[in-house]
């Protein structure tokens, strides 16, 4: 059985954002602009993505 995943890409820089938002982006495993990661689709990850959605592009 395959786990559901979501593909998250950082499309805007974290410069000038709140410290907590920068920490959330790092917690998602994103390091630089246009960096993409695949993450498990869990409520915790969805909450983190929702918090910094203005910086991200999400697929899946």
Curated annotation (Swiss-Prot):
Keywords: Ribonucleoprotein, Ribosomal protein. PANTHER family: LARGE RIBOSOMAL SUBUNIT PROTEIN UL30M, MITOCHONDRIAL RIBOSOMAL PROTEIN L30. Part of the 50S ribosomal subunit. This is Large ribosomal subunit protein uL30. CDD domains: Ribosomal_L30 (cd01658). It holds the Pfam family Ribosomal_L30. The lineage of its organism: Bacteria, Pseudomonadati, Pseudomonadota, Betaproteobacteria, Rhodocyclales. GO terms for cellular component: cytosolic large ribosomal subunit. It comes from Aromatoleum aromaticum (strain DSM 19018 / LMG 30748 / EbN1). The keyword Ribonucleoprotein applies.
């Amino acid at each position: 059985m395959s786990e559901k995943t979501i593909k998250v890409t950082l499309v805007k820089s974290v410069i000038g954002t709140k410290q907590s938002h920068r920490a959330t982006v790092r917690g998602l495993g994103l390091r630089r602009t246009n960096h993409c990661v695949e993450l498990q689709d869990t409520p915790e990850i969805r909450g983190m993505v929702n918090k910094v959605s203005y910086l991200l592009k999400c697929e899946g």
